[in-house]
């Protein structure tokens, strides 16, 4: 009987009782991000979701009737606005603030952004002028393949796409070379005269950033003597910037073989490059660009391409030619150079040995 009573007391089910657990949550903020950001409530029984997550932390601040905030006076702000950078640094040091340690000076890195030109050349490939020999079959096959692809892209991604734009339905490559030569000459004349208005008319923003430093602190002298070979179009490319935006930009690479004079001087009048008297035969691959997305787009000089087989450019002249009078004043007599420290010690040692003898 006693055993049955014990079994009934253990096995007999009783009514389920649910109790609410009220826990402090601010010790779980590091692990429970939803509770910390207020997405979930700390107290499930509370219907007020606007209660601050960490109530205990801000309880003392909410109990204060007033809060003292240090605000600078208007007169101090006016003085700071009139201070120079040196005076401002001294004032901050008086307050115990090191401006170069705790607050670094702001550095401005500004760059011009435009959508009527692209800062680069779309396709810098230029077919080689001298075709390879047939003995090297692999290289010859690759060369022929690249030439065929290049001609196909000139039509598919070049002239065909340009003629679809309004105002360029009658675009012809054969008549473009004469216009390219005129743009080339006008751009260099504007550069020689430092005329920014004319430069932006004949060159793009990408070319301006490269050409303007030559005349900003110096000068350029340019003269086109003659055109040795008729200019011809080498590559035609058309693309949109940004991609799939319809803002089409066209680039045409023209091979120009000319005889010209070019001289670059520094701000002191010293010759840096070239000569005003010497004529040179120059072969250049000049890139011209046009914002064909607009009807009134104009062709402008954009840059140059330097293939691998082309001759290296002339380096800058680091010396100046002396006149006959300056050469006569120069003394050609040999002079003994001052001795080095080790040589001086050896010489002093020898003199001491001779004195002892």
From Swiss-Prot:
Q: Where is the composition biased (Basic and acidic residues)?
A: 341-357
The UniProt entry, under InterPro entries, shows: mtLSU_mL45 (IPR051975), NTF2-like_dom_sf (IPR032710), Tim44-like_dom (IPR007379)
Give the start-end ranges of region Disordered: 333-357
User: Which gene holds the coding sequence for this protein?
Assistant: mrpl-45
Q: What is its main location?
A: mitochondrion
Listed name of the protein = Large ribosomal subunit protein mL45
Stored SUPFAM superfamilies: NTF2-like
Taxonomic lineage of the native organism: Eukaryota, Metazoa, Ecdysozoa, Nematoda, Chromadorea
UniProt record similarity statement: Belongs to the mitochondrion-specific ribosomal protein mL45 family.
Localization per Swiss-Prot or TrEMBL: Mitochondrion
| Keywords from the UniProt entry | Mitochondrion, Ribonucleoprotein, Ribosomal protein, Transit peptide
Q: Under the cellular component aspect of Gene Ontology, which terms does the record hold?
A: mitochondrion; ribonucleoprotein complex; ribosome
Gene3D superfamilies linked to this entry: 3.10.450.240
SMART domains recorded: Tim44
């Amino acid at each position: 009987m006693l055993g049955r009573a014990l079994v009934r007391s253990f096995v007999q089910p009783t009514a389920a009782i649910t109790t609410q657990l009220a826990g402090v949550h601010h010790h779980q903020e590091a692990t429970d991000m939803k509770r910390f950001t207020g997405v979930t409530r700390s107290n499930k029984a509370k219907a007020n979701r606007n209660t601050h997550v960490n109530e205990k932390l801000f309880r003392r601040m909410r109990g204060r009737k007033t809060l003292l905030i240090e605000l600078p006076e208007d007169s101090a702000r006016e003085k700071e606005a009139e201070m120079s950078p040196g005076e401002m640094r001294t004032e901050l040091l008086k307050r115990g603030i090191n401006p170069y340690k705790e607050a670094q000076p702001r550095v401005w890195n500004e760059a011009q952004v435009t959508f009527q030109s692209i800062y680069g050349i779309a396709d810098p490939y230029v077919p080689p002028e001298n075709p390879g020999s047939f003995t090297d079959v692999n290289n010859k096959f690759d060369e022929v393949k690249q030439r065929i692809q290049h001609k196909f892209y000139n039509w598919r991604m070049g002239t065909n796409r340009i003629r679809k734009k309004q105002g360029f339905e009658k675009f012809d490559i054969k008549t473009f070379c004469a216009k390219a030569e005129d743009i080339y000459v006008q751009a260099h004349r504007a550069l020689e005269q430092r005329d920014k208005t004319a430069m932006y008319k004949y060159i793009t923003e990408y070319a301006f950033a490269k050409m303007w430093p030559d005349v900003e602190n110096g000068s350029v002298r340019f003269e086109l003597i003659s055109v040795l070979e008729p200019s011809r179009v080498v590559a035609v490319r058309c693309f949109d910037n940004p991609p799939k935006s319809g803002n089409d930009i066209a680039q045409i690479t023209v091979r120009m073989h000319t005889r010209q004079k070019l001289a670059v001087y520094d701000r002191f009048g010293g010759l840096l490059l070239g000569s005003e008297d010497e004529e040179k035969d120059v072969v250049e691959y000049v890139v011209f660009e046009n914002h064909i997305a607009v009807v009134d787009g104009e062709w402008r000089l954009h840059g140059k391409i330097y293939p691998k087989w082309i001759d290296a450019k002339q380096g800058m002249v680091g010396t100046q030619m002396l006149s006959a009078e300056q050469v006569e004043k120069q003394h050609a007599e040999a002079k003994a150079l001052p001795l080095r420290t080790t040589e001086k010690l050896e010489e002093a040692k020898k003199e001491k040995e001779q004195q002892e003898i």
